[in-house]
Amino acid sequence: MTPFASPAGRPALLRAAVAAALCCTAGTVYAQAQQPAASTPSQREQELQNRVEKLERRIGDLESSAVLSEPETTVKRIEVYVDENGVQYTEPGPGRTPQVTYQRERTFRRQTISEKLDEAMEDAASRSVGVGVDAAIVLQNVQQDTGPDAPADGNNYQLASADIFFTAGLAQNTIFYADIVGLSGTPPDNEVGGLTLLNGYTARLVNQNELNLRESWIQTQLAKERVGLTIGRVDLTNYFDHNAVANDETTQFLSDALVNNPMLGLSENGAGLAAVYDPKNGFSAKFGYQQSSSTAQNLSDSLFYLGEVSKLFTPFNLGEGTYRVWFRTDNSSGEDQTAYGISLDQKLTASLTLFARYGEAEAGPDEDDEFYSIGFQLKNGVVINPEDAWGVGFANTELGAGDAEDLLEGYYNLRLTQKMQLSFHLTHVTEKPLGVEEVSYFVPGVRFQASF
């Protein structure tokens, strides 16, 4: 700390301090030069000259990179000694009683220019609204493989998607988030008519060719950031049934069956809450509820309750693996129905990760729907660029009513820049409707994604 001074006097104080240091150092060097030594006088003079030049460089660096801050008021805890007349002393003495008091001081603090700029930017960021964009264009083609002629055979499809999201800090450990999404184009799902979506960008969105509010919520962290609460319009698939390598349609698999477990049953985003307990030891527990119908008349209609526990393991000296188990209930059919599922991802090496999902849901008095998926992702190995990744996944869906679907997808995600990615996909899907001849398709596709 340096004593308080007016802003106009700061440069003078700085120069005076530097001049005093220079004189002191020069005097020391001169005194040393007067003492007998083995070196010649010319060597001493050269040494003195070098040290003076070094000090001048330091003065220049100090003046160009350091500033004195605006005066700051600080509160300092001090101990004083008070006699019977109330007079305060700084030293103990007869008849003096020690007391603790607080004293305010106005001081300057020397800062580098970069520190000052960082503080200003952090302060501005905490008071402003952050805006981000995640945009994608997906091109797909459908080629029928087997079965009777279908309307999708030979057709091309294009879907453009743009997410504009806003974030703002409201208080300590409390943020606001909103995501507005717009879709335009035609995915192949309208003509293929499969059990799951071949383009996961349209999942849980009702209308296309218009803007939709995907999410809007407030999140806060409590109990030393071990408990997180999110309330508003939410998408519970962001909190439940996670998977490290099969959970993101923007960078991983494009088919929705390899992004989310269809046994979760969530068809639309809606009002809800998510609570997460994470003690930072590899274990976490989650609970949430969400309405999944835009035509519901009250919060009790089409209401889903979900709970999940997860644990991080390193079995058999392998890499890290996360194992999750979830359970849900919903009344969207007019009666309470239940479902459960698991999701796991396990690293075998630093580059290779396996994944698997399973789920089962009540579909009627004596009928259950079932689903499973398996696959892998290879990253930073057998790739073109160091940050590229590719994967292969298989998913099987069987409804209690008798319909079934098999889906196989492979993709290669090419990292173009830090903000742009280009991926290539090839999907083979077989639809097996009850009582109707099965039909299968090859669906090649290209996805361009940019985020900024």
Which residues make up each language-model segment?
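Outer-membrane beta-barrel "beta-signal"
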Residues: 376, 440-452
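Transmembrane beta-barrel strands of outer-membrane/channel proteins
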Residues: 133-141, 178-182, 229-233, 287-291, ...
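Residues that define the transmembrane beta-barrel architecture of outer-membrane proteins
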Residues: 154-160, 209-214, 267-271, 301-305, ...
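Surface-exposed coil loops of outer-membrane beta-barrel proteins
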Residues: 189-217, 224-304
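Repeated loop/turn-to-beta-strand initiation elements of outer-membrane beta-barrel proteins
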Residues: 172-176, 225-229, 281-287, 315-323, ...
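N-terminal periplasmic/intermembrane-space "pro-region" immediately following the signal or transit peptide
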Residues: 2-4, 20-23, 29-151, 169
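Detector for outer-membrane/organellar transmembrane beta-barrel domains
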Residues: 307-399, 410
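Surface-exposed loop and membrane-interface regions of Gram-negative outer-membrane beta-barrel proteins
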Residues: 139-161, 169-216, 222, 296-301, ...
